[in-house]
């Protein structure tokens, strides 16, 4: 572990050492494969990026100097190391903003990054308080880490980046003078008011009116129908009431003759309680102050039995048995998704395409050597495209990019939307870097008196002026190219570029076409049947010294498809007598531009003509599908927008994805089945509506009467298939006992199949039938009866709608800001993504709402911060109004039910299961005829297999029967392995993985993106595929030690996994246990307890450390959730996951404590009423070893 100015390396750096080599990083041979391609490259890239900050280069507004980073790996990401890392880098007396970013491999095996939503302000006053704050922060970080990695289906975590900013000066003038402790964050639920409403101080908790005080006798009118007067101390109370009503513009109140009045006194304050009967068992009550002011009205009491009654105040109803609360119900008013209908009278035809080509420069970084664009109007002329080449049109990549952008911004091509395939992952990095560099050059010229103007004749004119004075520098400091972007998940979806001209502003917009057509360009061209198809090009042939190459055609080794060299037959078609790189590049570039343009134009016309929807108004295929659904299919249906934070958090906890499991790792004569449009099919089931109420009962809720999302205790019946998912570093389907949130219909399915479900609380919804039936049926019919582009478009629309409802409710704002502005935002707003694009500019995506919690954590005054942002509109829409997580959670649950029922039927019919993914099953028997076919929701037989190897989720090899080889492009195998090149694997390697239990090597591609320097390098490297990577089920071995089957993991409420039928505990080669220990990191090492979780005693590491049992802990969690304080609830939950000590009582009262940080167990007992450490012991393979006189003895106590 070594500090290098701004970066610390933890974890795997235990094997890594710094030396005076080029990169300063060495690693042991046993770790070489790890460092070769994953962590080492990550560390080295950042090391190079942050390496040298000599004093002459330091600038106060440099982002590189403002943001420091600490890197940790996942295996050693512990609370202990986290605290030490911050202690080593943070200085007492400072204020810091801390963010956490994770680098991981996604479900396709590609490197990706995400910012955890755990941003925190930390004031370092003294060491002890600081450590407590950091402990609490780690708990928040770890929960976010687990949730995000599960949400993004991460296959492997490569590194955790702790980013911190010294923020002593940001908003210093608004700092609070006395802050001695952290304040808890509360959701927007009026907990205090609800407590007050239902307290004895408001109204006695009984329906017996003798406890309401002295009954008063009113005066009635002559017909004895209404009360005219009620004199109290000589004053007519009825007149006071109606005078107050008139003053407050409320209705005149008539009390009928049956109204009863009581004078009630509490804490020296007097009230008047009125009681009116609605029925024999129901009364409504109103409470007035003696001034006539209506303090609380419409209190509805209902007698349920002689002892039990319910009281409703506002939207809350509570049932009481004496003074005990036995049931709660809170009605929630949910907004609904509304259609903002805007009919279009004409198709937006101002569209174009953009693309660029790169090569490796002398620094081995990618640089642009050709680029161009086309528009619909241009494509109809002889010119067709406008393209630039490095050696012909400019001397540098920067120069030709700026020339191209300037032409696009000219009067002929302005106001166009330019589609670029993979804009966010590639092209935009080069564009942004060039524009920011050009802005800097133009500003420097302005200060020298040289002004740059873009004229309508497309030329740039330079006018000499007097140098700008210091007084005018600020007003002249505006960027020449004004840039705005929209980010999502660390990728740019849209980029708008504007320049000021004498006649106003010229603007162009870049949109990533991959997000609305998620497939490779060559595949799209074939499906759309474009006139111009994407060609083949020898990318690796292009180098600095070949840019002007003219000669023979490059050799066949340079022409590849998916990293595989093309056939000789195909290569022969590419040979030409004189091969000119510039001409070939521009020809290839033009084909790409025109091919994509034709695809977009066809797409644009199709959705406009069929649905009257503009393609250009959608940045993603999911948004386009939603626009079509809302416009054509929503009708009178009411879909709720879940904006309430507690409700959103609870339903999000019940939102699980698809299940990918290996059951048997190897088999012969198998069938591979896929479901036809699984999610659209199950979306035709009954869906949650917009009427919602929170319900909770001390006696438990009856599952058969429920529909919605509920928190429950689950106890399984230990069968071969797990039926309910659990988030635990991915999705597992275990046996055991735990608590969790689930969709009611999935709970009913589990209960029918033997699970014991105790429902504790949750959200009851009304039911909507046929919400998506018309949409699904129409699009599936079109898909089934069409081909080419229409079939592909319909497929995308059909499969993309439902996931859109599961988006986060919070809108993000994306800006390019100065470093100082970014630092201020880090103090007040939660950051989603941040990238340095120059020394002084930051591309930042953040939640628009100023966070009171974050502000106060930094020791600032929230109200004064709001006042300092005078243009801020607190009521401005900061949330999406068209997302409904309840829909997405229900759809995915219905899909799991459907797949689980099919798997149970296979087992019931004598079949075996080998592998399953979200919508596919591999088995050794034929499915019944009624389940197989081409209809929606039926299975299709994708392949018959001679053999199948299933090593892990999404890592398998299928050897096909002869009649299915042609269907597979004349290949006899189907290989899949987490994003690696399929050509780097073969059957023999899978045999080594399975039969020989040997790891194998494969090749995968990674993108190294550098916004600051403006390049993206696509690199290939060797990775290891682990033979024992699968840990989502417990493995079963034959007598020869060969893995032959699996069973569910055993999962307990404390998140401790226990393999109850593993090999003998004293076996040194306990593979199951080792796998589970590895699986459960970085949470804690596995400890096996013979006792029930309810017998555990937990050590609570607070300022006043104490021991509590599990029931007390559950009570604390529930109380925090009831009080809508999720921060406290999550913090307590983390004590189960990674607390300082876990312990339980022995027979003699001795406590056994396990410390994950020290990796030791301590036995403590009371001696003179003090807890003391008696023996130092170790834990191995299920046994405790006691250290005595430097030797360890087996402990059997």
Swiss-Prot record:
Domain of life the protein comes from: Eukaryota
Localization of this protein: Mitochondrion
Catalysed reaction, written as an equation: DNA(n) + a 2'-deoxyribonucleoside 5'-triphosphate = DNA(n+1) + diphosphate
E.C. number(s) listed in UniProt: 2.7.7.7
Chief place of localization: mitochondrion
Keyword Mitochondrion on entry: yes
GO molecular function, one term: DNA-directed DNA polymerase activity
Enzyme class label: transferase
InterPro entries xref list: DNA-dir_DNA_pol_B, DNA-dir_DNA_pol_B_CS, DNA-dir_DNA_pol_B_mt/vir, DNA-dir_DNA_pol_B_mt_lin_plsmd, DNA/RNA_pol_sf, DNA_pol_palm_dom_sf, RNaseH-like_sf, RNaseH_sf
Tagged with keyword Transferase: yes
Keyword line: DNA replication, DNA-binding, DNA-directed DNA polymerase, Mitochondrion, Nucleotidyltransferase, Plasmid, Transferase
GO cellular component, one term: mitochondrion
One of the GO biological process terms: DNA replication
UniProt xrefs under PANTHER family: DNA POLYMERASE, DNA-DIRECTED DNA POLYMERASE
Family: Belongs to the DNA polymerase type-B family.
UniProt miscellaneous comment: This DNA polymerase requires a protein as a primer.
The protein, known as: Probable DNA polymerase
Organism, scientific name: Podospora anserina (Pleurage anserina)
Origin organism lineage: Eukaryota, Fungi, Dikarya, Ascomycota, Pezizomycotina
């Amino acid at each position: 572990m070594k500090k290098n100015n701004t970066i610390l390396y933890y974890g795997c750096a235990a094997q890594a050492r710094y030396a005076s080599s080029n990169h300063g990083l060495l690693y042991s041979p046993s770790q070489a494969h790890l460092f070769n391609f994953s962590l080492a490259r990550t560390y080295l890239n950042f090391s190079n990026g942050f390496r040298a900050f000599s004093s002459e280069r330091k600038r106060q507004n440099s982002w590189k100097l403002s943001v420091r980073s600490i890197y940790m790996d996942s295996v050693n990401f512990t609370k202990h190391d986290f605290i030490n890392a911050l202690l080593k880098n943070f200085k007492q007396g400072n204020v810091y903003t801390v963010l956490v970013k994770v680098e991981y491999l996604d479900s396709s095996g590609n490197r990706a990054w995400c910012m955890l939503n755990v941003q925190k302000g930390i004031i370092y006053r003294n060491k002890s308080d600081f450590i407590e704050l950091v402990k609490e922060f780690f708990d928040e970080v770890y929960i976010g880490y687990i949730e995000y990695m599960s949400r993004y289906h991460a296959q492997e975590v490569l590194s955790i980046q702790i980013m911190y900013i010294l923020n002593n000066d940001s908003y210093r003038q608004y700092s609070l003078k006395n802050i001695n402790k952290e304040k808890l964050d509360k959701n927007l639920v009026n907990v205090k008011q609800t407590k007050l409403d239902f307290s004895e101080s408001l109204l006695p908790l009984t329906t017996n009116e003798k406890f309401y005080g002295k009954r008063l006798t009113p005066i009635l009118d002559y017909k004895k129908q209404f009360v005219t007067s009620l004199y109290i101390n000589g004053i007519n109370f009825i007149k006071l009431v109606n005078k107050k009503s008139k003053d407050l513009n409320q209705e005149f109140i008539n009390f009928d003759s049956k109204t009863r009045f009581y004078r009630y006194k509490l804490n020296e304050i007097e009230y008047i309680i009125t009681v009116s009967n609605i029925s024999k068992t129901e009364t409504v009550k109103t409470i007035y102050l003696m001034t006539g002011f209506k303090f609380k009205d419409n209190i509805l009491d209902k007698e349920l039995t002689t002892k039990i009654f319910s009281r409703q105040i506002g939207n809350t109803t509570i049932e009481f048995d004496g003074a005990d609360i036995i049931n709660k119900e809170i009605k929630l008013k949910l907004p609904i998704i509304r259609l903002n209908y805007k009919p279009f009278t004409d198709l937006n035809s101002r569209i174009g395409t953009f693309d660029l080509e790169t090569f490796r420069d002398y620094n081995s970084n990618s640089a642009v050597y050709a680029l161009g664009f086309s528009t619909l109007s241009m494509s109809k002329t002889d010119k067709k495209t406008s393209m630039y080449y490095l050696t012909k049109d400019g001397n540098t990549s920067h120069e030709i990019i700026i020339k191209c952008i300037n032409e696009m911004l000219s009067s002929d091509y302005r106001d166009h939307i330019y589609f670029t395939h993979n804009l966010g992952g590639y092209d935009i990095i080069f564009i942004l870097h060039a524009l920011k560099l050009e802005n800097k050059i133009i500003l420097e010229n302005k200060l020298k008196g040289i002004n740059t103007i873009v004229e309508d004749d497309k030329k740039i004119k330079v006018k000499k002026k007097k140098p700008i004075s210091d007084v005018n520098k600020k007003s002249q400091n505006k960027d020449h190219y004004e840039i705005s972007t929209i980010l999502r998940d660390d990728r740019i979806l849209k980029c708008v570029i504007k320049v000021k001209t004498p006649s106003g502003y010229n603007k162009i917009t870049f949109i990533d076409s991959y997000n609305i057509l998620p497939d490779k360009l060559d595949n799209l061209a074939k499906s759309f049947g474009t006139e111009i198809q994407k060609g083949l090009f020898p990318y690796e042939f292009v180098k600095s010294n070949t840019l002007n190459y003219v000669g023979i055609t490059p050799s066949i080794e340079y022409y590849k498809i998916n990293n595989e060299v093309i056939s000789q037959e195909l290569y022969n078609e590419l040979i030409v007598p004189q091969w000119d790189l510039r001409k070939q590049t521009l020809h290839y570039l033009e084909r790409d531009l025109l091919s994509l343009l034709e695809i977009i134009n066809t797409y644009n016309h199709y959705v406009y003509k069929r649905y009257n929807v503009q393609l250009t108004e959608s940045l993603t295929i999911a948004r386009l599908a939603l626009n079509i659904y809302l416009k054509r299919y929503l009708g009178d249906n009411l879909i709720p927008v879940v904006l309430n934070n507690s409700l959103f958090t609870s339903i999000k906890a019940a939102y699980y994805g698809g299940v990918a499991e290996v059951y048997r790792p190897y088999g012969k004569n198998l069938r591979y089945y896929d479901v036809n449009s699984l999610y659209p099919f199950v979306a035709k089931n009954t869906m949650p509506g917009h009427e919602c109420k929170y319900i909770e009962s001390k006696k438990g809720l009856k599952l058969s009467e429920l529909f919605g999302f509920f928190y429950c205790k689950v106890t399984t019946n230990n069968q071969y298939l797990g039926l309910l998912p659990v988030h635990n570093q991915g999705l597992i389907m275990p046996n055991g006992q735990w608590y969790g949130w689930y969709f009611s219909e999935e709970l009913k399915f589990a209960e029918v199949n033997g699970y014991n479900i105790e429902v504790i609380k949750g959200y009851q919804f009304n039911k909507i039938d046929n919400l998506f039936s018309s949409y699904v049926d129409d699009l599936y019919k079109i898909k089934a009866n069409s081909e080419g582009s229409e079939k592909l478009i319909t497929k995308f629309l059909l499969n993309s709608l439902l996931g859109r409802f599961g988006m986060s409710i919070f809108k993000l704002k994306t800006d390019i800001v100065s470093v100082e502005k970014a630092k201020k935002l880090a103090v007040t707003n939660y950051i989603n993504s941040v990238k340095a694009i120059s020394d002084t500019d930051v591309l930042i995506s953040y939640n628009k709402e100023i966070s009171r919690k974050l502000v106060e954590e930094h020791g600032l005054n929230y109200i004064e911060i709001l006042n300092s942002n005078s243009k801020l509109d607190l009521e401005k829409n900061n949330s999406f109004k068209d997302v409904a997580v309840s829909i997405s959670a229900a759809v995915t649950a219905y899909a799991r039910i459907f797949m689980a029922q099919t798997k149970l039927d296979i087992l019931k019919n004598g079949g075996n299961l080998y592998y399953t993914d979200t919508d596919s099953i591999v088995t050794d028997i034929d499915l019944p005829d009624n389940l197989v076919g081409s209809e929606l929701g039926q299975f299709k037989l994708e392949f018959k297999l001679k053999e199948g190897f299933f090593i892990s989720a999404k890592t398998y090899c299928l050897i096909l029967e002869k009649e299915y080889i042609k269907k597979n492009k004349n290949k006899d195998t189907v290989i899949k392995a987490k994003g690696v090149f399929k050509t780097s694997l073969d059957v023999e390697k899978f045999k080594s993985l399975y039969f020989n239990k040997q790891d194998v090597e494969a090749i995968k591609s990674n993108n190294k993106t550098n916004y600051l320097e403006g390049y993206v390098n696509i690199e290939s490297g060797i990775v290891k595929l682990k033979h024992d990577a699968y840990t989502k089920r417990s493995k079963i071995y034959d007598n020869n030690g060969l893995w032959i089957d699996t069973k569910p993991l055993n999962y307990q409420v404390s998140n401790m996994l226990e393999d109850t039928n593993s090999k003998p505990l004293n076996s040194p080669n306990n593979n199951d246990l080792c796998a589970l220990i590895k699986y459960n990191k970085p949470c804690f090492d596995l400890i096996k307890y013979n006792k029930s979780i309810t017998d555990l005693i937990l050590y609570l590491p607070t300022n006043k450390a104490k021991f509590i049992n599990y029931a007390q802990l559950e009570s604390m969690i529930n109380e925090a959730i009831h009080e809508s304080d999720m921060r406290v609830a999550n913090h307590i939950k983390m004590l189960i996951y990674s607390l300082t000590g876990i312990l339980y009582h022995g027979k003699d009262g001795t406590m056994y404590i396990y410390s994950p940080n020290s990796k030791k167990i301590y036995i403590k007992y009371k001696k003179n009423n003090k807890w003391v450490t008696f023996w130092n012991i170790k834990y191995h393979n299920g046994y405790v070893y006691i250290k005595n006189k430097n030797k360890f003895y087996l402990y059997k106590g």
